[in-house]
């Protein structure tokens, strides 16, 4: 390290010496020229034939300098104390010689011409300005200069090589071919594929979207689309391809397709049970029948409470489940609505029940919902017990009811059939005990059993949102026992039981078979009628729920109705189909379902109802915003809007209609639909006139001089021109005159002038029939 520093210092000194030498030469030249104006000095300068002589003398010492401009040679000599020295320079050969003595003499080859002297000593100038140069100059100066030049040359050479290397690398980068770049991209893609390899086999259902298939194959959707285009199939990223196309596409990448059924993945494996643990269970009884035939009254008698006080209009709005004890035995009753809108509820009631009690009024007899209940029970293969109600009324006719029901294969036992008939009066508490005895007898004959030690299985009867507790679902347990903390799947929803509340409103830790219970803990709102089943773990519940959601999406995608150009042209462009959009909110999911089905049935060729959104719960700000954006009205069934929702509805001018009885909701929507119907246009005959003269008025047209034979003729009336009993023209009266006056109408037996719009081919003897157009309001018919 110190050696390098010394070398650098030595180089610096040498550079300074060279610079000072150059400076000395300049000073000498300057003094030579300045001697011309200073004749008192001891310096002599002679010029002759392009030759210069310079001499200097001090203390007996002489010096001489000569320069030959033509020969470019010079000599220098110095004598001091008898010693001599000489210096010569040849500019062409760039060589120099130096000899030192105490006496300095500068001698030119030819000393001639004038001499000039100066008082300034050149020797003194050298000693004053650069005293170290002359004394330190030696024979090694040229070697040091060469060494310095060598190092400078090496440094310059390194810089040149560095520049050449940079240019060479740049040229190599720019000269890469497209093939090389493609190769690098392929190598990069290969590395990515190694990180996310394509599976050897892929499971799909009947069809799959390109994006989903790409996700399963760990590829980009654009790659699959490009491959399909190469195969001659044009698709978009969200378009579905069938299993055959998917198989061909996947095989292009060296994989295989397994067409599977998602239905298998949504089924929870049944628990292996010990049949010896199955014991007798209480019967589940569903009370069914037509509206207002006394079903709810019967159940209230069984419970010794008056449920009708809490039901709007005396109509059961959703399923009520209750358990009673009779003769030390439990019986669970389900009360289903009798209104036609609640078909799905009655169907579910029949599916989860053991016995159906069909209530028929002894006055009204068999009604539409009575027949429907019979069909539901037969479809579910459930035995029926007929309870003929209201026998206390004077107009009751039980035999008539038996005869009507026998037409539906419900033949009484006393008529030789196998159907149990019981005559009751729920109002007067007549025949109730006999009915309960028949129910228990039928249950004993059916040998109803269940295993309380297995995981619970049941059905979701209804669901609602409670402001204080969240989602609350009514569940009927068909088999097993449900405990607080159990993980479960309800339809496509999963959850964990947080609380169990029985029909008395009491929180319990568990519930056994054939019992209805309110379950808290659903992750989302299930649909009424969904299967309910407890799983081993919460992880399994989430997995089954996810698979069932995929299944719902798959099935809904298959059932999407396609819009054809014909439908689009007929219903939208011509405006022949009008639409009433509704956002439906109700207190429970069952009511939402029933009302939605009833409203969407109100459709004909001109108008239809479309429920754009429906859910259980209060009317919120989100519902109002949705209604405003979609131009819909909001219907609340047993629910009301929040304060903020009502304020927003007033601001957005959104109509909110609230109902407590389903009759009123359906009736009002029908009225709205009738107002949307285009009225019928009818032509009413008002009279006719005979053409007795034809007058052609220039710049006006042809005027028919007529005599009103019958009725009257009105201006703007629609006319039919009749000739020889045939209609030859139909048009509108554009002008009606009496003499020169315009009139609105002309009565019978008066003459008038009639001009028909855009018609001039009128002749004498023609008959002009006049009609008045009337619009008649339509009544809604489905």
From Swiss-Prot:
Kindly give the Gene3D superfamilies that the UniProt entry links to this protein: P-loop containing nucleotide triphosphate hydrolases, Translation factors, Translation initiation factor IF- 2, domain 3
Q: Which SUPFAM superfamilies match?
A: Initiation factor IF2/eIF5b, domain 3, P-loop containing nucleoside triphosphate hydrolases, Translation proteins
Biased segments, Polar residues type: 31-43, 86-106, 133-142
**Membrane listed as a keyword:** no
Keyword entries, A-Z: Cytoplasm, GTP-binding, Initiation factor, Nucleotide-binding, Protein biosynthesis
Under the heading CDD domains, the entry gives: IF2_eIF5B (cd01887), IF2_mtIF2_II (cd03702), mtIF2_IVc (cd03692)
Q: Where are the residues of the annotated region G4? A: 389-392
Pfam families xref list: EF-G_D2 (PF22042), GTP_EFTU (PF00009), IF-2 (PF11987), IF2_N (PF04760)
Q: Could you tell me which residues belong to the region Disordered?
A: 1-106, 132-174
Instruction: Tell me the segments the record calls region G1.
Output: 289-296
Q: Where is this region: G5?
A: 425-427
Which molecular function GO terms apply here?
A: GTP binding; GTPase activity; translation initiation factor activity
Give the subcellular location.
Cytoplasm
Q: What does this protein do?
A: One of the essential components for the initiation of protein synthesis. Protects formylmethionyl-tRNA from spontaneous hydrolysis and promotes its binding to the 30S ribosomal subunits. Also involved in the hydrolysis of GTP during the formation of the 70S ribosomal complex.
- Give the family this protein belongs to, as stated in its UniProt record: Belongs to the TRAFAC class translation factor GTPase superfamily. Classic translation factor GTPase family. IF-2 subfamily.
Name of the protein in its database record? Translation initiation factor IF-2
Which organism encodes this protein? Borreliella afzelii (strain PKo) (Borrelia afzelii)
Tell me the lineage of the source organism.
Bacteria, Pseudomonadati, Spirochaetota, Spirochaetia, Spirochaetales
**Encoding gene (name):** infB
């Amino acid at each position: 390290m110190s050696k390098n520093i010394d070398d650098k210092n030595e180089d610096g000194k040498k550079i300074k010496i060279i610079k000072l030498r150059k400076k000395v030469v300049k000073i000498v030249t300057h003094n030579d020229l300045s001697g011309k104006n200073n004749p008192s000095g001891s310096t002599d300068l002679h010029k002759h034939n392009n030759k210069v002589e310079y001499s200097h003398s001090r203390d007996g010492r002489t010096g001489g300098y000569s320069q030959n401009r033509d020969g470019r040679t010079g000599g220098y000599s110095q004598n001091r104390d008898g010693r001599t020295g000489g210096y010569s320079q040849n500019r062409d050969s760039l060589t120099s010689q130096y000899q030192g003595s105490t006496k300095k003499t500068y001698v030119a080859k030819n000393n001639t011409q004038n001499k000039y002297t100066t008082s300034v000593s050149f020797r003194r100038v050298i000693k004053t300005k650069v005293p170290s140069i002359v004394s330190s100059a030696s024979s090694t100066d040229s070697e040091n200069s060469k060494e310095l030049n060598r190092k400078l040359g090496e440094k310059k050479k390194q810089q040149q090589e560095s520049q050449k290397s940079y240019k060479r690398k740049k040229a190599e980068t720019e000269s890469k071919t497209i093939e090389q770049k493609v190769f690098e991209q392929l190598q990069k893609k290969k590395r990515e594929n190694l990180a996310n390899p394509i599976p050897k086999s892929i499971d799909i259902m009947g069809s799959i979207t390109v994006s989903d298939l790409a996700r399963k194959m760990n590829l980009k959707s654009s790659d699959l689309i490009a491959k399909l285009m190469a195969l001659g199939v044009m698709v978009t990223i969200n378009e579905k391809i069938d299993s055959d196309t998917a198989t061909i596409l996947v095989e292009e990448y060296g994989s295989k397709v397994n067409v599977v059924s998602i239905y298998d993945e949504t089924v929870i494996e049944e628990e292996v049970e010990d049949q010896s643990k199955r014991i007798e269970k209480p019967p589940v009884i569903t009370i069914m029948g037509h509206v207002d035939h006394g079903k709810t009254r019967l159940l209230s008698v069984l419970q010794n409470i008056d449920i009708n006080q809490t039901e709007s209009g005396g109509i059961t709005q959703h399923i009520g489940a209750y358990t009673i004890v009779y003769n030390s035995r439990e019986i669970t009753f389900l009360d289903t609505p009798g209104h036609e809108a609640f078909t799905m509820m009655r169907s579910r009631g029949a599916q989860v029940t053991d016995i159906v009690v069909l209530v028929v009024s002894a006055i009204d007899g068999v009604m539409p919902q009575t027949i429907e209940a019979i069909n539901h029970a037969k479809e579910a293969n459930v035995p029926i017990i007929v309870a003929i109600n209201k026998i206390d009324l004077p107009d009751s006719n039980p035999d008539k009811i038996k005869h009507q029901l026998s037409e539906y294969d419900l033949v009484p036992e006393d008529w030789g059939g196998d159907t149990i008939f019981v005559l009751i009066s729920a109002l007067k508490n007549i025949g109730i005990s006999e009915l309960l005895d028949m129910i228990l007898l039928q249950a004993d004959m059916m040998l109803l059993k269940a295993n309380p030690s297995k995981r619970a299985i049941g059905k979701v009867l209804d669901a609602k949102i409670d402001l204080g507790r969240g989602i609350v679902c009514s569940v009927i347990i068909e088999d097993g026992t449900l405990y607080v903390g159990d993980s479960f799947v309800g339809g496509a929803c999963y959850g964990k039981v947080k609380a169990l509340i029985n029909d008395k409103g009491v929180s319990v830790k568990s519930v056994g078979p054939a019992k209805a219970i309110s379950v808290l803990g659903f992750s989302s709102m299930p649909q009424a009628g969904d299967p309910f089943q407890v799983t081993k773990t919460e992880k399994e519940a989430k997995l089954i729920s996810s698979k069932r959601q995929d299944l719902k999406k798959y099935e809904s995608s298959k059932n999407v109705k396609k819009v054809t150009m014909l439908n689009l042209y007929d219903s939208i462009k011509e405006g022949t189909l009008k639409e009433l959009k509704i956002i439906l909110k109700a207190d429970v999911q069952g009511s939402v379902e029933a009302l939605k089905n009833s409203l969407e049935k109100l459709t004909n060729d001109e108008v239809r109802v479309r429920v754009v959104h429906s859910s259980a719960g209060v009317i919120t700000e989100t519902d109002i915003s949705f209604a405003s954006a979609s131009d819909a009205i909001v219907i609340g069934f047993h629910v009301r809007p929040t304060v903020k929702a009502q304020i927003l509805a007033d601001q957005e001018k959104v109509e909110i209609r609230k109902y407590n009885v389903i009759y009123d909701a359906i009736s009002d929507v029908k009225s709205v639909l009738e107002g949307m119907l285009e009225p019928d246009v009818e032509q009413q005959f008002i009279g006719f006139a005979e053409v007795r003269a034809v007058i052609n008025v220039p710049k006006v047209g042809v005027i028919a001089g007529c005599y009103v034979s019958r009725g009257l003729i009105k201006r703007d009336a629609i006319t039919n021109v009749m000739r020889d009993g045939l209609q030859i023209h139909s048009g509108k009266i554009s002008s009606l005159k009496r003499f020169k006056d315009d009139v609105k109408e002309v009565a019978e037996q008066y003459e008038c002038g009639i001009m028909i719009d855009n018609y001039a081919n009128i002749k004498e003897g023609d008959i002009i029939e006049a009609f008045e157009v009337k619009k008649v309001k339509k009544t809604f018919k489905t």
